């Protein structure tokens, strides 16, 4: 029987949420928005998975000031792209590390013949940046399902089901 380990990224491979929060704030500043997510607010916003979804939730549920008078379906992806750019730059500058023991766990799992994959709601660019800086790339992972590869984000199991399908493993 094939055995596999499927990793999430944020909070599993690495503690990234503070870096994500700061990247959102850089994106807001770069877009000329007066928004600032402090830690307390960001912890509330983490109830929603997905960066684009989190921005929409903030706008619709927290009386965001100075929301541009544009179609949010167009605006949010552009703003999120700025956030992704800020985040990947921060990761490339070494601001994010693997959690202790992760590198050894991956090495041991590979040595034992376990198959490895990633199932996450973060964007592919974020995953690529983290893996490039911390592990020298994605070669240890057979499958990476990230971002908008599924319609329903966590806690829905869709990204895990898709990962298992791509690995040829039963759910």
Predicted segments with their positions:
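Alpha-helix N-cap/helix-start capping motif
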Residues: 17-18, 49, 121-124, 157
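N-terminal helical cap/lid subdomain that shapes the substrate entry/recognition surface
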Residues: 2-9, 13-100, 107-112
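Conserved beta-strand segments that form the floor/walls of ligand-binding pockets within enzyme
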Residues: 6-8, 117, 145
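Long alpha-helical scaffolds
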Residues: 4, 117-119, 164
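Substrate-recognition "cap/lid" segment bordering the active-site pocket of phosphatases
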Residues: 93, 123-171
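Residue-level marker of regulatory loop/turn positions in helix-turn-helix DNA-binding domains and
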Residues: 98, 119, 152
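Residue-level detector of short coil/turn "hinge" positions at structural boundaries
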Residues: 35-37, 66, 116, 138, ...
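Substrate-recognition element of Asp-dependent hydrolases with the DxDx(T/V) motif
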Residues: 24, 102-132
